[in-house]
From Swiss-Prot:
Official protein name in the record: Mannosyl-3-phosphoglycerate phosphatase
Organism ancestry: Bacteria, Pseudomonadati, Pseudomonadota, Gammaproteobacteria, Enterobacterales
Catalytic activity: 2-O-(alpha-D-mannosyl)-3-phosphoglycerate + H2O = (2R)-2-O-(alpha-D-mannosyl)-glycerate + phosphate
Cofactor(s) the protein requires to work: Mg(2+)
Superkingdom, natural source: Bacteria
Organism of origin: Escherichia coli (strain 55989 / EAEC)
HAMAP family tied to this protein: MPGP_rel (MF_00617)
Record keywords, A-Z: Cytoplasm, Hydrolase, Magnesium, Metal-binding
Subcellular location: Cytoplasm
C-alpha cells in the first residue's frame, strides 16, 4: 500500500499514455496532474521525444522545473534546482546524434537498408506524419543522442539491421509510431534509476515509484518501478513485464490520458 502523501515519484510516457495518440489531448489527466502537483509529487516525463519537445510539453502540463527523460533515456534534463550537479542542465548518455547519423548513412549506402530518418525530411513532412504543427514538428528534429526513423524494409532485413547496430554499440528500439536508434548503454530504466537515486540522495529516503506507459519501449522503465500502469495502446506487441503481479501492475481498459487517469484512480483513489 502507498499514498500520494509519502515520498513518491511518478514517471510517465507521453504519446499514447499521458497524451492521446491522435489528438495529443491530455485533459482527462488534468485533475490528477493538479492533485499530484498540490501534493508536491514530481511527475517525471519519460519519452522518445527530444528535450526541446518535452520542455515545451512540460510547461504546457504545468510540470516545468522538474527533471525529465528524453530520447528513450539517452538524455536527462535535470531539475532546475539541481544546478550543482555535473552536466547541468542536461546529461547525455553515449554517442551523439551526429555520430549515430553517420553510422546510419554508412549502413544505408553500403548495405542498402531502406529507412527514412527525421533528418531526411523537413518539418512539413514530419507535421504530416505526426499531426503536429510545423513549429512543434521542428522541435522533433533537435535530437542530441538518438535518431528517429521509419523502417521501409522487410522484417528479415530489420533483424540484420538490428544485429549490425548491436555490433556497433547501438540499439534499435520500437516506439508507439516510429523506431529509434541510440547508444546501447542508454535506456529509460537507467535514466529513471539515476533520477531516483538523486532524489534519495537529496532527501535521505528512497521514494516510492509509479510508472505509466503503453509501448514496448516503456517496458524497461516499468520493470524498475515499484508499481506500474500499462495503458492500453495501439502497438500490436503491447507491453510485457517479467513481474506482472496484480498487486504492482495494472492494465487499463481505456487508452491514452483516460487510461492514465484510470491507472491513478486504481492505485490511489481507494487508498
Amino acid at each position: 500500500m502507498f499514498s500520494i502523501q509519502q515520498p513518491l515519484l511518478v514517471f510517465s510516457d507521453l504519446d499514447g499514455t499521458l497524451l492521446d495518440s491522435h489528438s495529443y489531448d491530455w485533459q482527462p489527466a488534468a485533475p490528477w496532474l493538479t492533485r499530484l502537483r498540490e501534493a508536491n509529487v514530481p511527475v517525471i516525463l519519460c519519452s522518445s521525444k527530444t528535450s526541446a519537445e518535452m520542455l515545451y510539453l512540460q510547461k504546457t502540463l504545468g510540470l516545468q522545473g522538474l527533471p525529465l527523460i528524453a530520447e528513450n533515456g539517452a538524455v536527462i534534463q535535470l531539475a532546475e534546482q539541481w544546478q550543482e550537479i555535473d552536466g547541468f542542465p542536461r546529461i547525455i548518455s553515449g554517442i551523439s546524434h551526429g555520430e549515430i547519423s553517420q553510422v546510419l548513412n554508412t549502413l544505408r549506402e553500403k548495405e542498402h537498408f531502406k529507412f527514412t530518418t527525421f533528418d531526411d525530411v523537413d518539418d512539413a513532412t514530419i507535421a504530416e506524419w505526426t499531426g503536429l504543427s510545423r513549429s512543434q514538428a521542428a522541435l522533433t528534429q533537435l535530437h542530441e543522442a538518438s535518431v528517429t526513423l521509419i523502417w521501409r524494409d522487410s522484417d528479415e532485413r530489420m533483424a540484420q539491421f538490428t544485429a549490425r547496430l548491436n555490433e556497433l554499440g547501438l540499439q534499435f528500439m520500437q516506439g508507439a509510431r516510429f523506431w529509434h536508434v541510440l547508444d546501447a548503454s542508454a535506456g529509460k530504466d537507467q535514466a529513471a534509476n539515476w533520477i531516483i537515486a538523486t532524489y534519495q540522495q537529496l532527501s535521505g529516503k528512497r521514494p516510492t515509484t509509479l510508472g505509466l506507459g503503453d509501448g514496448p519501449n516503456d517496458a524497461p522503465l516499468l520493470e524498475v518501478m515499484d508499481y506500474a500502469v500499462i495503458v492500453k495502446g495501439l502497438n500490436r506487441e503491447g507491453v510485457h513485464l517479467h513481474d506482472e503481479d496484480p498487486a504492482r501492475v495494472w492494465r487499463t481498459q481505456r487508452e491514452g490520458p483516460e487510461g492514465w487517469r484510470e491507472g491513478l484512480d486504481h492505485f490511489f483513489s481507494a487508498r
